[in-house]
């Protein structure tokens, strides 16, 4: 199986600073690529569950995610290795599965890498991914990364 585990703030919802809910708009390009992703999609955020729901609803992509893992529902925060193990267990991930983990913070990507996930750095400086051995891929946006995954380009 293939799974996508997505951070929320500054990864799916690019805002780089204070977020005002009124400014969040649906992103039809992102929605298209998320719908085309070849596996189940999950949110893993250090924000609260209510915040995640609010943002995903405003982006009109809430229904595309199977589950939200948030700090108030897991009682853990990234980059906790225990959190990554709990997510693996809850989803039912096996060693034969492929997990794409999308995040903007390098320390969170280390958590995913340490757990056997394929890491995707979403960041304006994504070209510098070579500086970090635990970052497999770097992109300016989730849409750009999913375009490659969904068109079967090897990442």
Predicted features and spans:
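Active-site residues of response regulator receiver
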Residues: 7
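Helix N-cap/beta->alpha junction signal
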Residues: 27, 45-48, 105
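Substrate-recognition element of Asp-dependent hydrolases with the DxDx(T/V) motif
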Residues: 32-57, 69-71
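Asp-based, Mg2+/Mn2+-dependent phosphohydrolase catalytic module
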Residues: 2-4, 14, 24, 57-67, ...
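Short, acidic loop-to-helix structural element flanking the phosphoryl-transfer center
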Residues: 18-42, 78-81
């Amino acid at each position: 199986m293939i799974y996508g585990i997505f951070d929320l703030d500054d990864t799916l919802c690019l805002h780089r600073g204070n977020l005002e809910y009124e400014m969040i708009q649906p992103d039809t390009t992102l929605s298209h690529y998320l719908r085309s992703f070849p596996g189940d999609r999950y949110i893993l955020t250090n924000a609260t569950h209510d915040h995640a729901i609010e943002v995903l609803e405003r982006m009109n992509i809430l229904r595309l995610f199977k589950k939200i893992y948030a700090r108030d529902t897991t009682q853990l925060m990234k980059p906790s290795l225990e959190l990554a193990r709990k997510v693996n267990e809850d989803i039912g991930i096996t060693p034969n599965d492929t997990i794409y983990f999308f995040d903007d913070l390098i320390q969170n990507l280390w958590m995913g890498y340490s757990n056997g996930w394929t890491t995707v750095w979403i960041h304006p400086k994504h070209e510098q991914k070579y500086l970090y051995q635990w970052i497999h891929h770097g992109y300016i946006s989730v849409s750009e990364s999913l375009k490659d995954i969904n068109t079967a380009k090897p990442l």
